[in-house]
Amino acid sequence: GSNYTLVGMIPGDSSYQQGNSNIPTEVGGLYVYIGLNGSVAAASGAATAGTATATFAVGDILGWAFDAENGTLQCYKNGVSQGTQFTNIRTDIGWVFCVTDYDNSATATYVINFGQRAFAYTAPSNYKALCTAALSDPTIADGSTAFDTKVWSGNSTYPRSITGLNFSPDLIWLKNRTSAYDHVLMDAIRGTGTTKWLSSNLTSAEGVNYANANVTSLDANGFTIGSTAGTDILNQSGTATVGWAWDGGTSNTTIAAGSLNSSVYNQSAVWSGMCSPAPSSGTYVQGFDGNLTSVFASGISAGSYFTFTPTGGLTFSNSVRVYMGNVSGASYQYNGGTTGSLPINSWTTVATGGGTMTSLGVTRNVLDVHGWFAIEVDGKLLVDSDVTPPNVPSIPSTVRANPSAGFSIVKWTGTGSAATVAHGIAAPKFIITKSLANATNWVTGHDSIGWGNFLFLDTTDAQGASAAVWNNTAPDSNVFSVASSSYINPAGSDVIAYCFSPVEQYSSFGSYLGNGSADGPFVFTGFRPRFVMTKASSASGLWNLHDTERSNSNPASKLLWADSSSQEVDYAGGDFTIDCLSNGFKARASTSSLNSSGVTYIYIAFASHPFKTARAR
């Protein structure tokens, strides 16, 4: 029959189904009509169609070179370029390769090589095969070297050593699976023993329930459980227990107030002396004092610029950013050319990739022109050399950090007022905190809900909003912020924090939107999960704890909950279940605590293997 073969791409979330006579453009995609005349077409808004290709016959080899970053597509026939078939391809969505016979009238076999074997023709320069072998090598090749899960059966024999970890654990989180006993958390900063454990399902202060659990040591490849005066909730005969463990580095470090100033500020000059014209309200020093709430203003006409002209130019290797506070209608001009708006209360990147800044001007479209609140070059605020900026961090802390695994343990004494605390890793996306001496809630922060909001780990509550918790400030690569809340920063009392930053192909912290179906949303993590914790953030819901040690095949159905002492429940394909896949996880139930339609859920996940080496299970 006639050859009506179409080769194309469709959006990753498309409803396209082979055999239903749909062509890619009907579902927001694009195609090349290789079987008939080589014509090209794209759905409205999907791409701009360009050069047609030659016609392909049986035995011809089509090359498909898609540049997802720049939104271009070039085809090759038997190794010869056919020009550029598409430009301006949407870069804000995922794309899936597809091939179809337009009218389903022909019987055809398509052999597609995504890199599983050698190509017949050399791929264009800077293009990679669409297969996991082409992925970059992961920082952590084996997730069990930084995080792992262990299970054991109690035997009421002491001391009981739990071994088999590939690291010395610095945080352990333990839960009896058989009985409704409390969770137990211990770490290398606070130490071990009956008076040192905390429970994620209780507001109790440290060690209040000391008689029921006793971890006597954190060892080279595990930990040791000791005897107790009360009911042993960790090694009782006839019960099963699970333990999750993280590697937090090798030693505790005291980080003094102000000890990170040189990492945060560039004080190599009096920058305020390199600006013009003079403002009538305030001085240029307010743009170079390290304070993001002060600003200079007025004295120039609307549309005129306050301009910073660094002597000899200021070279940079990464980026230049400007902070604009609570002032609307401001804009910038960089090096006398590039212009752009400056949204209120936010940083705006004005240059990237390296270069020399010779001038930076800020203006406003009204007479009351305001200047910049701060300028940052290569991650450091420009601060006058004769100014004393705020200390970073503002208070001291004890930190045990494993930057390569994106995990740290932090302990500090609360101040009862706004403060910054050092954490020792890349900017955390998830933080768990607990006041040690007070019966208060566990407070968590998650990047997906914003740092003006919080969740309690020990309750099912939806997210709450309060500037008194994280001071409406996202963590950066040096510190996280706390405010006046007695939950997180009680004056004179110690607080512990567990901080997590994402490491590509090892850990992921994000969110997904529920669809209310057993065919739930897929969440890409970039690895096969070993551990997944989920929680409804926009509505009430449980903190679900999954791992592939307890559920070693899909669906992962054996559930515990961080906010509950309940024993493990095996839902065997029903409520709460997920599939753990080679590159993420997928909700397989519509229960309200996992996948209600229209509800937003946060997740925290750690890898068994990176996507590059993960295989189907």
PLM features per residue range, with description:
Residues 2-3, 9-268, 272, 291, ...:
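Surface-exposed molecular-recognition determinants
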Residues 1, 174, 291, 299-327, ...:
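A short beta-strand element within beta-rich, extracytoplasmic domains
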Residues 367-370:
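Short acidic/polar inter-strand loop motif in beta-rich domains
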Residues 338-354:
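Extracellular carbohydrate recognition and processing domains
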Residues 18-22, 258-311, 334:
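Disordered, acidic Ser/Thr/Pro-rich linker "stalks" and the adjacent N-terminal cap
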Residues 320-324, 358-365, 587:
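Extracellular beta-strand-rich recognition modules
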Residues 323-342:
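Extracellular ligand-binding interfaces
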